[in-house]
A protein has these predicted regions:
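Bacterial N-terminal signal peptides
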Residues: 7-16
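Short, polar/charged alpha-helical segment
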Residues: 28-53
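Beta->alpha turn/N-cap motifs
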Residues: 32, 56-60, 70, 74-84, ...
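Short helix-initiation/N-cap motifs at beta->coil->alpha
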Residues: 55-65, 152-180
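Ligand-binding "clamshell"
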Residues: 85-97, 110-112, 184, 189, ...
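A conserved helix-loop-strand patch within extracytoplasmic ligand-binding domains
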Residues: 97-147, 248
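Periplasmic-binding protein-like
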Residues: 99-108, 134-141, 199-268
Length: 268
C-alpha cells in the first residue's frame, strides 16, 4: 500500500512539474526596440522548444508590479537605477539577472539649433521619476549646462544642482510622455528610443547633445523575482537573446540603423 501511495505522490509531482514546464515563459517589455527584439528571440526560442509569451506595457511601473504578482516570469524594460528605486520604494527584492541593450539619451529641441543659443530662462523637460531624472541631470551636467553640489548622490535630482548659469526652468514629465514635451519645452532630455517610438527620427538625428557610452548601469536589464533566478527557462531565453544575430539586427533597425543611438554592453 505504501508503494502505491509513494507512486501516486511521485506521479502527481511529475504531473505538476510537467504542467509548470508547459506554461509559456511570460516576458514583460515596453514598445519599441525592446519589444521588437524580444519578439525575435521568442521566435527563435520556439524553434528550440521554449514557448515564450511577450507582453507589452506602456506604463513604466506595471511590468514590475506584474512580476511581483507572478503574472510575469521576467521583464526587460528597466535599467539598474530604476530597479533599485522600485525595490527600495516598494520593499521588494526583484533581481537583475543579465544585461541587455543600452539606449543612449540626449538633449533635443525643435526651437534651437545649439546649446549656445539657448536663452536665459529656457525651459527643460525631463523625467519625473528618480532614476531617469538622475540620468537627465547627469546629461545636463556633462553638457555644461549645470553643476552639482559636491556631495550630490549618484542619482542626483533637480535639488542637487549647485549652479544653473542660464537659469533653466525645469518641467518634470512622466517618462513615456517626454517625446511629446518637445512641443512645449525649449529643450527636452529624452532617450533616443523614446524619440523613435514617437516617430521623431529627424529630431533624434539633430540632437544638441548626445550622452553615449557602453557602461551597464544605464543598460536595460533582464529582471525576475528572487525565487525565480534559477529558472532554466529564464537563462535559456537570455542566452538566445544575447547570442542571436537576428536580435542584434533588429535592435540596429529599431534604432534607425544609427549605431550612435545605442550599444550592446554584453559584448564588451
Amino acid at each position: 500500500m505504501k508503494f502505491f501511495s509513494s507512486l501516486t505522490a511521485l506521479l502527481l509531482s511529475l504531473a505538476t512539474l510537467g504542467a509548470a514546464q508547459a506554461q509559456p515563459l511570460r516576458v514583460g517589455v515596453t514598445p519599441g526596440s525592446l519589444a521588437d527584439s524580444a519578439q525575435i528571440a521568442a521566435r527563435e526560442a520556439k524553434a528550440q522548444g521554449l514557448d515564450v509569451q511577450i507582453v507589452e506595457f506602456t506604463d513604466w511601473t506595471l511590468p514590475n508590479t506584474a512580476l511581483v504578482n507572478r503574472d510575469l516570469d521576467l521583464n526587460y524594460y528597466q535599467h539598474q537605477a530604476f530597479l533599485d528605486t522600485f525595490n527600495r520604494e516598494n520593499r521588494q527584492d526583484l533581481r537583475a539577472v543579465a544585461v541587455g541593450s543600452r539606449g543612449n539619451i540626449g538633449i533635443f529641441s525643435k526651437r534651437y539649433k545649439s546649446l549656445a543659443s539657448l536663452p536665459t530662462g529656457a525651459s527643460v523637460a525631463l523625467a519625473n521619476d528618480t532614476s531617469n531624472q538622475a540620468r537627465a541631470i547627469a546629461t545636463l551636467r556633462d553638457a555644461g549646462l549645470v553643476t552639482l553640489r559636491a556631495n550630490a548622490p549618484q542619482l542626483a535630482q533637480i535639488d542637487d544642482i549647485a549652479s544653473n548659469p542660464k537659469k533653466l526652468k525645469f518641467i518634470e514629465v512622466a517618462g513615456p510622455q517626454l517625446a511629446r514635451a518637445l512641443d512645449d519645452a525649449d529643450i527636452t532630455v529624452v532617450s533616443l528610443g523614446g524619440l523613435l517610438q514617437a516617430g521623431q527620427l529627424e529630431t533624434a538625428r539633430q540632437g544638441l547633445y548626445y550622452s553615449v557610452g557602453t557602461d551597464a548601469f544605464w543598460a536595460i536589464h533582464f529582471v525576475t523575482r528572487a525565487d525565480n533566478v534559477k529558472d532554466a527557462r529564464v537563462r535559456q531565453f537570455i542566452d538566445i537573446y544575447q547570442q542571436s544575430q537576428a536580435v542584434r539586427q533588429q535592435i540596429h533597425a529599431s534604432y534607425a540603423n544609427e549605431s550612435r543611438f545605442y550599444s550592446l554592453p554584453w559584448l564588451k
